[in-house]
């Protein structure tokens, strides 16, 4: 009997790399939520003559727009990753949080979630795979 649906084989190394990149970006975005870009207080010298049109170029205005856009982008990304991490089964969520978010070593993460070495390796592989599928960043063979 043939299975109705089979998951494709995935490239574990490249998929793990994608998940780690996504989680690194997540950590950066969480920090960015506190960052604000300051407007330049001095004018810059340019050779380009000023143009007279309806466009208004204020560094203060541009900085304010950048701040709003950057914060909104960071909030959206953090919310997306938070949502997907929270959708994981409990053990997978523990692995992702202890290993990748808190940046513990494999040994420390294994002790924190109270599993054997072989169980930890299997749980870590499954957690990475599940999160990759949820984020749609799986690399197939």
Curated annotation (Swiss-Prot):
This is Uncharacterized phage-related protein Lin1259/Lin1739. It comes from Listeria innocua serovar 6a (strain ATCC BAA-680 / CLIP 11262). It comes from the Bacteria.
